[in-house]
């Protein structure tokens, strides 16, 4: 999962999602897609619900289409995969965790956005097998140690930090928010001495070597 500090800019969520979508889920003959505002959704896209909607119905079905469970409510931060776009019924189907499927009327697509990249703030409370953190310069009030801490601790196995080493060092030093009693600062400071290194964690322990993740493992 790509986690970035900002929505706008060269490495912001909006630009990264556009680039990653074209690389990871490019258009193909026969692959359904739907444009809505500034977004373009395709079957196979990773998407995220961006507001609570207690009225959305979900259901879990067997491969034969029999409903085995159903309920109400999809919430801010829920992630899923676009599984169907039906221009006849004007609906887009997303499959969330536990095989919950939701059909969105096209007029509700404003509640979805691509989720190949999300902001670090939006990732709070979630975990991913592997995390990629792109860093360029940014406002000091945003680029601080706690933000870096939040991003790194979202990963269960591997963290890759790419970009500007000076920005990385400045974020370590910037305690703009309340200090945490943690050894993370020392750990990432040691990592920062080698700008060509890749920082990886497995079960909370820093690794000296790691296997480069596949594109699938980063999603």
Features from the language model and the residues they span:
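Conserved helicase/translocase motor-coupling segment
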Residues: 1-74
């Amino acid at each position: 999962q790509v986690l970035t500090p900002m929505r706008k800019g060269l490495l912001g969520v909006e630009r990264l999602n556009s680039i990653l979508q074209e690389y990871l889920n490019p258009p193909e003959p026969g692959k359904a897609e739907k444009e809505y505002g500034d977004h373009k959704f395709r079957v196979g896209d990773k998407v995220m619900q961006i507001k609570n909607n207690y009225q959305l119905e979900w259901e879990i079905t067997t491969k034969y289409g029999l409903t085995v469970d159903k309920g109400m409510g999809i919430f801010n931060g829920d992630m899923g995969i676009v599984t169907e776009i039906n221009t006849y019924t004007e609906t887009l189907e997303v499959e969330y965790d536990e095989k919950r499927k939701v059909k969105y009327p096209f007029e509700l697509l404003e509640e979805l956005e691509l989720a190949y990249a999300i902001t670090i703030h939006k990732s709070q409370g979630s975990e991913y097998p592997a995390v990629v953190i792109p860093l360029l310069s940014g406002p000091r009030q945003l680029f601080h140690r706690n933000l870096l801490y939040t991003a790194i601790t979202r990963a269960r196995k591997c963290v890759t930090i790419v970009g500007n080493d000076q920005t990385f060092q400045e974020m370590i030093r910037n305690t703009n928010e309340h200090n945490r009693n943690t050894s993370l600062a020392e750990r990432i400071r040691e990592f920062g001495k080698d700008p060509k290194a890749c920082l990886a964690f497995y079960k909370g322990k820093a690794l000296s070597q790691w296997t480069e993740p596949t594109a699938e493992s980063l999603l």
